[in-house]
Amino acid sequence: ALDGLSPDGGAGAVSLLIAAAAQEEAGDLDTAVASLDALAARTDVPAIYRDLASFKAAMLDAGTDPAARRTRLEALANPGKPFALLAQEQLALADLAAGERDAAITRLNAIIQDAGVSQGLRDRVQTLMVSLGAPLPDALPSGDAAAVAAPDATSTNP
């Protein structure tokens, strides 16, 4: 179904992302990461696809050298990048894995305070902060910090 797509531009990038997903599903993570890295390096596709490929590669390459993964994520975590907050979340998890709880909490606080944070990401970050015993910020852009600390028993939100 993807054979008729041009290898250049957005459609070609999507086909390469789909191919990398198929490689991942087949258990060939090294090939999937290499395919995603190749897409991330291409200048003939829109930046959003390059950044997505780089983020997906970092997620698949989680078992490799923590410093290399951190470098990859830090490049995506810059303000204005489309996956900045997701990369910040992963960097906070890397901080925790490295035993740097305070750095992780600082990073998580910054995510919560960002006006562009999605509700799903905010919920994940708040839940993580509560599990770490960290105080939630007093003023959140939207939502209620108390709702995370004491969720409504009738809530249907998983």
What positions do the PLM features span?
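Short extracytoplasmic
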Residues: 1-14
